[in-house]
C-alpha cells in the first residue's frame, strides 16, 4: 500500500514537471486582472470561490 502511494506521488510530480510556467499561470488564472474572473452576472473575486468550495470541508 505504501509503495503504491509513493509511485503515485512520483507520477504526479512527473506530470507537473511537464507543465510550463505560462501554461500553469493561464490554468490558475494568474494572468487575469487582479484575480477577478468575469462571469455573466458580475466579476467574482477568487476569494469568493475559495470560500464557497472550502467553507463546508
Swiss-Prot record:
UniProt subcellular location: Secreted
Chain positions with 2,3-didehydrobutyrine modification: 54
Keyword Transit peptide: no
Lanthionine (Ser-Cys) crosslink location in chain: 41-55, 48-56
A cellular component annotation (GO) from this entry: extracellular region
InterPro entries recorded: Lantibiotic_typ-A_Lactobact
Pfam families according to UniProt: L_biotic_typeA (PF04604)
Any GO molecular function: signaling receptor binding
Chain positions of cross-link Beta-methyllanthionine (Thr-Cys): 39-44
Post-translational modification: Maturation of lantibiotics involves the enzymatic conversion of Thr, and Ser into dehydrated AA and the formation of thioether bonds with cysteine. This is followed by membrane translocation and cleavage of the modified precursor.
Record key words, sorted: Antibiotic, Antimicrobial, Bacteriocin, Lantibiotic, Plasmid, Secreted, Thioether bond
Annotated GO biological process: defense response to bacterium; killing of cells of another organism
Principal cellular location given in the protein's record: secreted
Propeptide cleavage-removed residue intervals: 1-30
Domain of life: Bacteria
Signal peptide: none
Family: Belongs to the type A lantibiotic family.
Role, per record: Lanthionine-containing peptide antibiotic (lantibiotic) active on Gram-positive bacteria, such as Lactobacillus sakei, Leuconostoc mesenteroides and Pediococcus pentosaceus. The bactericidal activity of lantibiotics is based on depolarization of energized bacterial cytoplasmic membranes, initiated by the formation of aqueous transmembrane pores.
Name under which the protein is recorded: Lantibiotic nukacin
Species annotation: Staphylococcus warneri
Amino acid at each position: 500500500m505504501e509503495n503504491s502511494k509513493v509511485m503515485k506521488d512520483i507520477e504526479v510530480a512527473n506530470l507537473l514537471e511537464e507543465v510550463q510556467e505560462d501554461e500553469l499561470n493561464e490554468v490558475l488564472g494568474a494572468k487575469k486582472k487582479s484575480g477577478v474572473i468575469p462571469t455573466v452576472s458580475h466579476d467574482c473575486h477568487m476569494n469568493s470561490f475559495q470560500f464557497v468550495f472550502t467553507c463546508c470541508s
